[in-house]
C-alpha cells in the first residue's frame, strides 16, 4: 500500500469521526437549546447583562449601583463598552430595577448587542480553530460545526459569559507561543497576560515558560499582566482603592451558599462537596477540596517540568488547562470551552495515538461535548470526564518520562564501551607507528 493511500485512509477516519460528531452535536444542540430556553429563560444572557452593566456605571465594585459587585478587574469588561452603548437605555432601566432580566433579554437593542458580540467572537474562534487544525474541505466544515455546538460553548452562549474573550486570547497564545517570528512570540506573551487579566486563573499557563526555560518571556508576561490588571483601575471611579473591593467581592462570590454543590460547577471544590454529601460527612468537603485543588497544581507543575523533551503534543496543554478549570472554587461548565484547543490537537494527531488513547480521550471529549447537557444545566458527567482526562494526561506524561529515563540509562553503558574501544584502537595504532 502506497504512502499516499495510507494518508488518505487516515484522513477519511478523522473525517468520519467528525461527520458523526457533527450530526450528533447538531441534534443535541437543538434539543439543549429548546430545553434551556423553556426552563431557564429568566436566566438567559444573565452574565452578558451583568458584564455590560459594569461598563456604564462609574464604579462596579462598591455596590453603590444596585446589586453590582464585580469580581473582575476593569480589563475584563472594558472591551465590552461599545456593546453596552448599543443598549444603554435598557441597561440603565435594568440597573435601576425598573425592568427585570427577562424583560431586558426581550429588548431589541439588547438582543442586537448580544448577537453582534457573539457573532464577532464566534467568527474569531472558528477562524482560529481552522488555522490551528489546518483542515480543509468537508473535514473543516464538520469541525467548525462541531465546535459551534460544543456543550461548554452552548452553555456559554445561553449565559452570555465573557469567558469567550479569554478563550480567544488563550488560543492566540498557543498559536504563536513557538512561532519562529519574534513579534508573534511577543504577542503571545501579551495575549496570555490579557487572558489572565480577564480570568486570573489562565496565569497558570506561565508554567509553560518554566518548562521550556524561557525565563525572560516569563518575566515579560508577568510585567504585561501587572499592567493590564492594575493600570485600567485608573479609568474607574476610586482608582486603586477598588483593589480591596474586588478582593472582597471575589471571596464573597466563591463562598456563596450552594455554589459548590451546583450541578454546573465542574471544579474540584464542587466534586469534593458532592462526595462529602454522598458520604454524609460534611467535614470531608474542606479536606478533599484542598487536597484535590492544590495537589493538582503540584502534580501539574512537576509533570510539565519533566516533560521538557516530551513528544506528547496534547497532554501538556490538556493537563494545564484542566488544572486551571478544576482548581477554581466556583468553576461553571463554560470554563471547559478552553478544551477546544486540546481537542483540535487530538484530532490533528489522531493517528499517532494508541488504540487505547484514541478511545479513552475520544470518549471523555465526547461526554464533555454533548450539548444537551448544557440545556439540562447538568454537568456531572462532564465533571467526571474532565477529572479522568486530567489523570490520564498525568499517566501518559509520567510514563513517557520513565521510558525516556530508562532508554538513557541503557545508552550510557554502550557509549562508555564505544569510548573504550576507540581508545584501544588509538593506542594500538600508536604502538604500530
Where do the language-model regions lie?
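Primarily membrane-embedded glycan-assembly and transfer machineries that use lipid-linked glycans
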Residues: 2-180, 184-186, 215-334, 340, ...
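A general, composition-driven signal for non-globular sequence regions
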Residues: 10, 193, 287, 318, ...
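Aromatic-enriched
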Residues: 69-76, 345-433
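Transmembrane alpha-helices and membrane-interface helical segments
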Residues: 168-179, 208-209, 213, 217, ...
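Membrane-interface alpha helices of multi-pass inner-membrane proteins
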Residues: 185-209, 320-327
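Transmembrane-embedded, aromatic-rich helix segments that form part
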Residues: 200-212, 222, 336-338
Amino acid at each position: 500500500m502506497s504512502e499516499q493511500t495510507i494518508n488518505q485512509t487516515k484522513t477519511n477516519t478523522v473525517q468520519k469521526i467528525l461527520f458523526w460528531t457533527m450530526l450528533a452535536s447538531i441534534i443535541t444542540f437543538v434539543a439543549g437549546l429548546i430545553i434551556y430556553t423553556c426552563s431557564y429563560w429568566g436566566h438567559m444572557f444573565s452574565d452578558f447583562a451583568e458584564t455590560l452593566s459594569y461598563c456604564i456605571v462609574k464604579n462596579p465594585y462598591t455596590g453603590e449601583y444596585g446589586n453590582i459587585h464585580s469580581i473582575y478587574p476593569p480589563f475584563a469588561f472594558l472591551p465590552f463598552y461599545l456593546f453596552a452603548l448599543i443598549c444603554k437605555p435598557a441597561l440603565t432601566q435594568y440597573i435601576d430595577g425598573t425592568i427585570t432580566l427577562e424583560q431586558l433579554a426581550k429588548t431589541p437593542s439588547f438582543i442586537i448587542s448580544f448577537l453582534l458580540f457573539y457573532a464577532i467572537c464566534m467568527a474569531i474562534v472558528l477562524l482560529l480553530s481552522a488555522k490551528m487544525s489546518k483542515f480543509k474541505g468537508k473535514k473543516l466544515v464538520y469541525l467548525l460545526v462541531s465546535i459551534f455546538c460544543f456543550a461548554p460553548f452552548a452553555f456559554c452562549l445561553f449565559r452570555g459569559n465573557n469567558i469567550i474573550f479569554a478563550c480567544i486570547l488563550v488560543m492566540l497564545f498557543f498559536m504563536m507561543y513557538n512561532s519562529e517570528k519574534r513579534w508573534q512570540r511577543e504577542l503571545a506573551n501579551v495575549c496570555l497576560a490579557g487572558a489572565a487579566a480577564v480570568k486570573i486563573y489562565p496565569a497558570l499557563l506561565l508554567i509553560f515558560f518554566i518548562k521550556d526555560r524561557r525565563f525572560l518571556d516569563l518575566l515579560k508576561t508577568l510585567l504585561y499582566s501587572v499592567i493590564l490588571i492594575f493600570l485600567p483601575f485608573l479609568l474607574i471611579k476610586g482608582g486603586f482603592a477598588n483593589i480591596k473591593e474586588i478582593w472582597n467581592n471575589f471571596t464573597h462570590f466563591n463562598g456563596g451558599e450552594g455554589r459548590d454543590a451546583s450541578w454546573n460547577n465542574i471544579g474540584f471544590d464542587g466534586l469534593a462537596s458532592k462526595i462529602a454529601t454522598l458520604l454524609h460527612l460534611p467535614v470531608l468537603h474542606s479536606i478533599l477540596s484542598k487536597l484535590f485543588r492544590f495537589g493538582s497544581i503540584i502534580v501539574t507543575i512537576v509533570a510539565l517540568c519533566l516533560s521538557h523533551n516530551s513528544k506528547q503534543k496534547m497532554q501538556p496543554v490538556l493537563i494545564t488547562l484542566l488544572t486551571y478549570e478544576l482548581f477554581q472554587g466556583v468553576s461553571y461548565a463554560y470554563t471547559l470551552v478552553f478544551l477546544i484547543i486540546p481537542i483540535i490537537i487530538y484530532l490533528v494527531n489522531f493517528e499517532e495515538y494508541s488504540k487505547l488513547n484514541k478511545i479513552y480521550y475520544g470518549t471523555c471529549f465526547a461526554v464533555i461535548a454533548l450539548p444537551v447537557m448544557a440545556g439540562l444545566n447538568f454537568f456531572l458527567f462532564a465533571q467526571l470526564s474532565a477529572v479522568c482526562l486530567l489523570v490520564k494526561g498525568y499517566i501518559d506524561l509520567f510514563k513517557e518520562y520513565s521510558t525516556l529515563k530508562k532508554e538513557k540509562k541503557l545508552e550510557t553503558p554502550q557509549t562508555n564501551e564505544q569510548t573504550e574501544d576507540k581508545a584501544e584502537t588509538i593506542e594500538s595504532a600508536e604502538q604500530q607507528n
